[in-house]
Curated annotation (Swiss-Prot):
Family per record: Belongs to the AMT4 thioesterase family.
Name by which UniProt lists this protein: Probable thioesterase lcsE
EC number per UniProt: 3.1.-.-
Disruption phenotype annotation: Abolishes the production of leucinostatins A and B.
Biological function: Probable thioesterase; part of the gene cluster that mediates the biosynthesis of the lipopeptide antibiotics leucinostatins that show extensive biological activities, including antimalarial, antiviral, antibacterial, antifungal, and antitumor activities, as well as phytotoxic.
UniProt enzyme class: hydrolase
Keywords assigned: Hydrolase
Entry superkingdom: Eukaryota
Gene Ontology molecular-function annotations: hydrolase activity
Native species: Purpureocillium lilacinum
Gene, per the UniProt record: lcsE
Pathway: Secondary metabolite biosynthesis
Keyword Transmembrane helix: no
Annotated InterPro entries: AB_hydrolase_1 (IPR000073), AB_hydrolase_fold (IPR029058)
Gene3D superfamilies recorded: alpha/beta hydrolase
Length: 316
């Protein structure tokens, strides 16, 4: 959906079409989805029923094609204000986003965790839809090709270009060291336990396996000073398994595919080891995740990811 005057816009309603007796209990936490680098939220309107209120936030600067003043941190702060003051949402919520939206969601959660008394919402979990580890633009390998995106509207392309410039120097906020705890949670009709330093991984075939992280994560002194008092909310990653097409014939991966062959999309060893609890494969490349051919499958994967987020607990 192209941006409208409403922001955020409600995409799904929990109780719509339900009998009163079915929806009389506590409503599940609403899911707020943040736009991707193109600035729009059309993809989120293709997702099937998630049995909860779902909202989407588009880029307020989309139609003006202007860069965002204040960068990623300014964007995160403004989107929290939209949730609280415009949508009127309070209490526990889930955040999510595709690509850039995952980074913004993580930044919003970090901002709230750093000063929880300043906000009316708290973050119960994060759904990251193919948000690979962010390599700042200045650190990309020389000759990194652009993705081959066909038929992209001018405003979407300008939004993508603005994001490229915004991410040239920006780095993700840090959450601190791992707690060293084991965790338990449910997925589908199964219950799982993960040991410290492991992540649950589900392939397209539906088989689950524990993946051991290969690199321990250590903080610099400066990063330690920026760590919130609480740990990160649980996150689940959707991982596209196909490399995106690129311009030219170099054969090199584009920006979003720098870590495509890694099961954790580059996050291993670079971030808090407690944050990502599971990775679920998606039958697509990065820019094709919400193709109508896969939307039913993606919807079920998102439901499973949310179930993991909502059931994860330390295994004590």
């Amino acid at each position: 959906m192209a941006p409208t005057d409403r922001n955020p816009v409600q995409v799904q309603y929990y109780a719509k079409g339900k009998k009163t007796t079915e929806s009389s209990g506590p409503a599940p936490a609403p899911l707020i989805l943040i736009h991707d680098g193109g600035g729009t939220t059309f993809a989120y309107f293709t997702i099937g029923r998630l049995e909860r209120d779902v909202w989407a936030i588009h880029s307020p600067t989309f139609t003006s094609a202007q860069p965002w003043e204040g960068g990623m941190d300014g964007m995160a702060k403004h989107y929290i204000e939209l949730i609280e003051k415009v949508a009127g949402i309070k209490g526990k919520i889930l955040l999510g986003g595709w690509s850039l939206g995952g980074y913004v969601a993580l930044t919003m959660a970090h901002m709230i965790a750093s000063s929880p008394a300043s906000f009316e919402i708290s973050i119960d979990g994060i759904l990251m839809m193919d948000s690979p580890w962010l390599v700042a633009g200045r650190d990309l390998p020389i000759g990194t090709p652009q993705p081959a995106l066909i038929g992209i509207p001018d405003l979407v392309r300008k939004s993508l270009d603005n994001c490229e410039r915004m991410l040239y120097h920006w780095e993700l906020p840090q959450w601190g060291r791992s707690s060293g705890k084991a965790f338990k949670f449910s997925a589908g009709n199964e219950k799982f336990e993960t040991q410290p330093g492991t992540v649950l991984y589900r392939s397209l075939k539906g088989d689950w396996r524990a993946v051991e992280r290969t690199v321990s994560h250590e903080l610099t002194e400066q990063q330690a000073l920026q760590t919130p008092p609480s740990g990160p909310p649980p996150a689940v990653m959707l991982r596209s398994v196909i490399p995106a097409p690129t311009k030219g014939s170099s054969g090199k991966p584009c920006r979003v595919d720098q870590f495509r062959d890694e099961l954790l999309l580059g996050w291993d060893g670079k971030y808090n080891t407690d944050m990502i609890h599971a990775v679920l494969e998606a039958r697509s490349h990065h820019y094709d995740m919400f193709n109508q051919l896969y939307v039913d499958e993606v919807t079920e994967t998102i439901k499973e990811a949310i179930q993991i987020i909502e059931t994860v607990l330390p295994n004590e």
